[in-house]
Curated annotation (Swiss-Prot):
One of its GO terms (cellular component) is nucleus. This is Nuclear hormone receptor FTZ-F1 beta. Keywords: Activator, DNA-binding, Metal-binding, Nucleus, Phosphoprotein, Receptor, Transcription, Transcription regulation, Zinc, Zinc-finger. Residues 373-448 bind DNA.
Amino acid sequence: MPNMSSIKAEQQSGPLGGSSGYQVPVNMCTTTVANTTTTLGSSAGGATGSRHNVSVTNIKCELDELPSPNGNMVPVIANYVHGSLRIPLSGHSNHRESDSEEELASIENLKVRRRTAADKNGPRPMSWEGELSDTEVNGGEELMEMEPTIKSEVVPAVAPPQPVCALQPIKTELENIAGEMQIQEKCYPQSNTQHHAATKLKVAPTQSDPINLKFEPPLGDNSPLLAARSKSSSGGHLPLPTNPSPDSAIHSVYTHSSPSQSPLTSRHAPYTPSLSRNNSDASHSSCYSYSSEFSPTHSPIQARHAPPAGTLYGNHHGIYRQMKVEASSTVPSSGQEAQNLSMDSASSNLDTVGLGSSHPASPAGISRQQLINSPCPICGDKISGFHYGIFSCESCKGFFKRTVQNRKNYVCVRGGPCQVSISTRKKCPACRFEKCLQKGMKLEAIREDRTRGGRSTYQCSYTLPNSMLSPLLSPDQAAAAAAAAAVASQQQPHQRLHQLNGFGGVPIPCSTSLPASPSLAGTSVKSEEMAETGKQSLRTGSVPPLLQEIMDVEHLWQYTDAELARINQPLSAFASGSSSSSSSSGTSSGAHAQLTNPLLASAGLSSNGENANPDLIAHLCNVADHRLYKIVKWCKSLPLFKNISIDDQICLLINSWCELLLFSCCFRSIDTPGEIKMSQGRKITLSQAKSNGLQTCIERMLNLTDHLRRLRVDRYEYVAMKVIVLLQSDTTELQEAVKVRECQEKALQSLQAYTLAHYPDTPSKFGELLLRIPDLQRTCQLGKEMLTIKTRDGADFNLLMELLRGEH
């Protein structure tokens, strides 16, 4: 069928006084619904009226006439050029548009391009632009131009001087139509002419007929593309619009290109769109689930840079290979754990080694402070803490978080790995993000709900360079670390099974600890202490978010590594002298160590842990006074505590500081039955407490410690209990008691969910933990009374005395 054909239907008076007309087809687009009205020109009562001209499209048609069997002339399109089309139509000048019955009957009989049932069920274009083809849009042609008024006279249109297009196909098609009309006239009697003309022939448009407004350029061989379109339309499967509307431009870009690349090229593996990431995204432009060959922890921005010819670009396969290595090893050896802190450029060796290769061994025993003092592995800036799996600076932490949460898709304009440093880290975000992933930052550590507090319990995944480790470790320590790595490499798998804890089989790290829980003793990390910490650490994915946020600020409770280094420095200086000298010289060296350590001297503690001051109460007050400053800093960083007013914060601290101190001492003493561990390694037994009048208080603390040991309280339950004790809303001095109670209920719900999830065999554990709070409060009441009596005539301990005076 040709692209555009139109036949002039001219009514003439018949032999019976009626009117007879010739109806020839007008091409209608298959996607256009024929919801229009059509009037038959052969009605008996019709009268010939004035002729009207309706300007429909921007095409001029010149008409030829072909003879018909009864002697009438049928006008036929001879050629057309770009201009205006004038189609004379019959009808009355005051034609009414409400002839509904006759028009509906005409539509029922003629069946003019009605949509089939399959077409009604098929998809429809979202906008008018979806109806157009790429050629029409790109060519910039004006496709529809309608005149607002109907003229009453025939106005000849002047066509612009443009070449005539596609003359022969249109004339050939119209000659075929004329021949078909002759066959129909011969086959059917005159009485049934109207009926068969309505059912067999396609009529020309009258005044109420719909006119096709869509122009499609003519193609050779009678436009096979139109036939294919008609075939697909009849089948009920309409193709998607080739040019979607502008409001869906973002959707079209992401549905025809990978999320990790520019919409102009295709670099990535096939993917499956999904809404698992964020259902609130209006455009769904970044909701993708990749095929199984990609790890869920990989960046959505991979394979951006084309590798040079003849070379293997490591930024693509190195990350995937590393993930496969980690996934294949279920129980890492201690040698592998000793290499788990990697920060140097030697990690790029993963790009050129096989799957079975391992990292070069690096010495173990690195403290948190040594890691913080090292440069950022991504840009070389100063490290601010443990962020998303590695120690990094604040700038790279924020960049990684914004990139993942905002789903940024960066592309390197240089096409290769760019240098990332402090001065150039903002020039190429694509290479910077790839380096973040290579150094060990984890996508799953970013919170999708954008709440504060990341999942910082992920273990480090990079190794420290030997150049940085050599000045930090002594030769003996370096030799010991090398020996430990050699022994670990020869260790059999069945000998390493005891390194798995009882909470889901998580490997216990032997070289590093969680950043949120540094060593309580403050010395170098030991394997025994780290084993205990590993038993208490659980999988982060099953920990409630509130408990994880509380755990993230737990390190503020402890002394900093700088303070611990000041304490341990004199101990190492006088250790050799005290071992070779007599007891008197050892005593003098211990006294000298006490004098040279401000913290030990203020706390009244000696290097060997014995009480250097006979007044134990004064020592404990000094320790408590120093610890209270840490408690205040810890409270101000808690997620729930920050939402409370300043006056209520002070009131809560005054009422709970003693409970917090004693509860931390009891939890610290779980592994030492019969004695209470104080701060900085100080231990008090029941016999020592009797001689100082603290028997009742220490006895109650030992009883509470036994209950904690029996319940197997871990670190998450410990930090949750501290927050619950802090947010006690039963005091009358609170201004917003309801708000404090709501915060405490949130902590209670998180603790209950945690205990039920991790200890399903002991459902009563949550209730038993809460029963320990009244015992703790009674013990603290006794301790406060003793401190008030003992320190009435003693020295002033600043914050401790201020808190004691605030309660009385």
